[in-house]
Amino acid sequence: SPQKILNLIKKTKTPKNLKKFNAFYIIVPTEFDNVRELFQTKFDELFGPIINGRVFTIEQTKHAKTVVPSDKEFFIGLGYNNKLFGKKQNRLNVTLPKSAGPATVMALGHYIIGQIQKQHPNYFKNNITNYTKQTSKMFKSTIKPIVE
């Protein structure tokens, strides 16, 4: 239910030091593989090439995704208790309720990405006006930064 999702979000404590990281790795349960692309798109929209957002299931993670380590990468386990990947102090694990479905995972993941955004410069807001000017020329139609 929406109220249960909201309660889960409210009790999720995100670290206050996310601004020191320039890479984030979200591990989602295999059964929610279809939400990965949504999170990757949100990272691309908000941070472009400045902050790396990687999103994989635990099964995908097992296939050499973490060979190259970085002290500036933060790992987020959604419904996966990560005790292996990244430094211990660079991890957040969020337990999902047994009844969690795609809506719960989508809402929680977007909330956490929003918390990451709060602690970094507002790249999207600072660039959206110039972007819409460029794309308006490309599409030969006026595209506004704010959807009305």
Model-derived segments and their meaning:
Residues 1-148:
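A SIS-like phosphosugar-recognition module
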